[in-house]
């Protein structure tokens, strides 16, 4: 344990002043995402993408985090967070902090980006500004394609307020009966089955031939709003206003009471679709008070839950514009490269009626026996490394068993198809499919059923725990011996997100790791109560204890006259035990650099507490997702990668695995990655003691150092030196 420094003042690390609020820290993260959309150094259509991500992130935040806080308020929960706030206080501060960001998002889109789009020949017009010819075209389009799928729902004593589905766009329509002069209210849902933006053909919009033109269109809801007469014949349309509702979408299952977890999750998904309580109302800023009050009452919301939007609602639909053929307005495309160690690995290709055949080359197992392989995605190809490892295992005649954890995968997953092929080839295949992966529950249920149909042993996880670890175990017969090959990573087995997220993975056949992973899978699929592992750090078994011990060890080195150094990269830092250990280490003189993309509850730079701790966040083209933990250890350096963040949920309520990387060249590679990230002055933000983030700016464009650009350039340089490394 760390001993108190004689000169260190006594500090109560439980003092709320030493912690940032989790929810407000997350909002600060999303503000950094928004900034990418505001930054004129970002390509134009990529700026729209970041506005869409900002909106999509907020949707999930309200569906889960705000919904949870509201449930706590309703249950009269008054327990304080580490930063000293009640649930009610957090809701008020979320609302106060978020409103300027939402306003900023809409202002920059309506008054900056739309003009820039027009300069590039992309016109998102308002219906009121259209020519007569354009209106005639849209009226016919409405009759042919929109009107047949609309359903007006009256609201009166005989027609109760209709159910408003989660995240749907709706028109609140006020009509007047000319016979009785009575005003009536109706709701019209904007069909989610139709494109959000209706394109106008070139011959209709007639663009200026002397200016660039690529696309012209109008929001779908405006086309509906200006053609409502056909929905309410005989009525006078008084007004209509767009609104959007967000509902609680979290899933709660009493696992110990569920006879069949899959069926229980399915039932909760049905409840999510049918609808839980509303948590947010987004509404046009011009909506009159009587309509606003009516919606609030019918949805059970208060003023704090209502967000006035001056412009387009539901900006996550801006993802559409990334599909336009305008490469000059997007990030420069590039392809992942084949890791140098794997360039001569054979691939399986479609064969004759006997199935797949292999090309000439070296099998991946031979290469793994020659030394561990570290892969860095997306700079190095997931398909040519991890996916290839699993595919070869599926077809290799010497492989006996494949075991794997699946947390999230793609809709047309080649990983799942390889596991099915392995089962069909007579191998024993066991897969833990985590049914509780938020917003991927339905996808995972479908994969679980498909795997079971082909004879794969499928388990759904452990009661009370989410299995978040990213692990594969392959058991292979090699002569008289059995050898175990493993992959342990930081990211999901998803070829699509592997192109967008930065992640790391270790492929090895080190016996102690094979033994550890065997014990871990026995823990996941059977009744094993493994309490310790030779090499792996496993949550909830020993990870927090070991992490705290390694932090304390660095402090001990300092207290004994040596050097202490910690560098850790993760998505979020929330766990108070870890934070207190870091504070104590900082007091002892340990130099600590933290690369935390999202939530950070640790307050850096506080005198006599955390003046030796620096925190940066890297936000860029790719989502930083890898977790790396470096400890100097008196010169006997240790470095780990894995699936866990330093969050209480990861360390106590999830199954996680973190692995030491011990091969010297790979340790050096990981240290180089950390060094490049820490030197980033293009996409890095520094966390200040007051909770604000300040973006680093190079003194000149020539001095710009973007870590993601450097990693990309390094990968491309490898292909320049060796064209065989270009990924297919």
Curated annotation (Swiss-Prot):
Disulphide bridges, residue numbers: none
Catalysed reactions, as listed in the record: [phosphate](n) + ATP = [phosphate](n+1) + ADP
Protein name: Polyphosphate kinase
GO molecular function, one term: metal ion binding
Naturally occurring in which organism (per UniProt): Synechocystis sp. (strain ATCC 27184 / PCC 6803 / Kazusa)
Post-translational modifications: An intermediate of this reaction is the autophosphorylated ppk in which a phosphate is covalently linked to a histidine residue through a N-P bond.
Catalytic residues identified in the record: 468
Function, in words: Catalyzes the reversible transfer of the terminal phosphate of ATP to form a long-chain polyphosphate (polyP).
Keyword field: ATP-binding, Kinase, Magnesium, Metal-binding, Nucleotide-binding, Phosphoprotein, Repeat, Transferase
EC number: 2.7.4.1
Residues that bind ATP: 57, 501, 597, 625
Listed GO CC annotations: membrane; polyphosphate kinase complex
Flavoprotein keyword on record: no
Region feature (Disordered): 694-728
């Amino acid at each position: 344990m760390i001993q108190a420094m004689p000169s260190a003042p006594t500090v109560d690390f439980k003092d709320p002043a030493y912690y940032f609020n989790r929810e407000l820290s997350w909002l600060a993260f999303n503000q950094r995402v928004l900034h990418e959309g505001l930054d004129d150094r970002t390509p134009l259509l990529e700026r729209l993408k970041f506005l869409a991500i900002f909106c999509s992130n907020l949707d999930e935040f309200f569906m889960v985090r705000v919904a949870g806080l509201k449930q706590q308020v309703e249950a009269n929960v008054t327990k304080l967070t580490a930063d000293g706030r009640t649930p009610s206080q957090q809701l008020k501060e979320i609302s106060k902090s978020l409103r300027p960001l939402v306003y900023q998002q809409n202002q920059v889109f309506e008054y900056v980006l739309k003009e820039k789009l027009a300069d590039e020949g992309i016109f998102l017009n308002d219906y009121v500004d259209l020519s007569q010819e354009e209106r005639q075209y849209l009226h016919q389009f409405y009759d042919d394609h929109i009107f047949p799928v609309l359903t007006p729902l009256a609201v009166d004593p005989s027609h109760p307020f209709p159910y408003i589905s989660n995240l749907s766009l709706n028109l609140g329509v006020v009509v007047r009966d000319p016979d009785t002069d009575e005003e009536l209210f109706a709701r019209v849902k904007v069909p989610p089955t139709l494109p959000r933006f209706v394109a106008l053909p070139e011959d209709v919009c007639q663009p200026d031939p002397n200016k660039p033109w690529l696309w012209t269109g109008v929001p779908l809801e405006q086309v509906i709003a200006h053609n409502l007469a056909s929905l309410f014949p005989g009525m006078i349309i008084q007004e209509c206003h767009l609104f959007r509702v967000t509902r609680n979408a979290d899933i709660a299952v009493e696992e110990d009471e569920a006879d069949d977890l899959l069926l229980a999750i399915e039932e909760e998904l049905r409840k999510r679709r049918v609808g839980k309580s509303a948590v947010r109302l987004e509404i046009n800023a011009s909506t009159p008070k009587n309509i606003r009050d009516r919606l609030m009452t019918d949805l059970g919301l208060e003023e704090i839950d209502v967000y006035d939007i001056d412009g387009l609602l539901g900006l996550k639909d801006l993802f559409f514009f990334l599909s336009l053929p305008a490469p000059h307005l997007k990030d420069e495309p590039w392809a992942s490269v084949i890791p140098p160690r794997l360039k001569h690995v054979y691939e399986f290709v479609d064969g004759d009626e006997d199935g797949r055949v292999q090309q000439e080359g070296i099998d991946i197992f031979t290469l793994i026996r020659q030394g561990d392989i570290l892969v860095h995605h997306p700079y190095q190809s997931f398909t040519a490394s991890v996916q290839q490892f699993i595919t070869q295992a599926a077809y290799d005649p010497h492989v006996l068993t494949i075991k794997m954890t699946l947390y999230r995968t793609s809709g047309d997953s080649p990983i799942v198809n390889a596991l099915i092929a392995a089962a069909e080839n007579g191998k024993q295949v066991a897969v833990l499919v985590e049914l509780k992966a938020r917003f991927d529950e339905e996808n995972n249920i479908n994969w679980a059923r498909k795997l079971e149909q082909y004879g794969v042993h499928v388990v759904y996880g452990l009661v009370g725990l989410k299995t978040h670890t990213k692990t594969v175990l392959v058991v292979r017969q090699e002569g008289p011996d059995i050898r175990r090959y493993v992959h342990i990573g930081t990211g999901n087995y998803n070829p699509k997100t592997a192109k967008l997220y930065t992640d790391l993975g270790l492929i090895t056949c080190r016996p102690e790791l094979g033994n550890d992973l065997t014990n871990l899978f026995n823990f996941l699929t059977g009744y094993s109560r493994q309490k310790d592992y030779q090499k792996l750090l496993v949550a909830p078994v020993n990870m927090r204890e070991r992490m705290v011990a390694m932090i304390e060890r660095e402090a001990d080195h300092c207290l004994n006259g040596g050097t202490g150094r910690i560098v850790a990269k993760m998505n979020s830092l929330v766990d108070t035990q870890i934070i207190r250990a870091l504070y104590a280490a900082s007091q002892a003189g340990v130099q600590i650099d933290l690369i935390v993309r999202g939530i950070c509850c640790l307050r850096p730079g506080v005198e006599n507490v955390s003046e030796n701790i620096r925190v940066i966040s890297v936000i860029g083209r790719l989502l930083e997702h890898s977790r790396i933990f470096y400890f100097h250890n008196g010169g006997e350096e240790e470095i780990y990668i894995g699936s866990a963040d330093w969050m209480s949920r990861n360390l106590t309520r999830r199954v996680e695995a973190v692995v030491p990387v011990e091969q010297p060249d790979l340790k050096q590679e990981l240290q180089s990655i950390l060094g490049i990230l820490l030197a980033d002055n293009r996409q890095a933000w520094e966390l200040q003691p007051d909770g604000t983030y300040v973006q680093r700016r190079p003194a000149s464009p020539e001095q710009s150092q973007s870590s993601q650009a450097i990693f990309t350039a390094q990968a491309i340089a490898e292909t320049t030196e060796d064209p065989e490394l270009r990924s297919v």
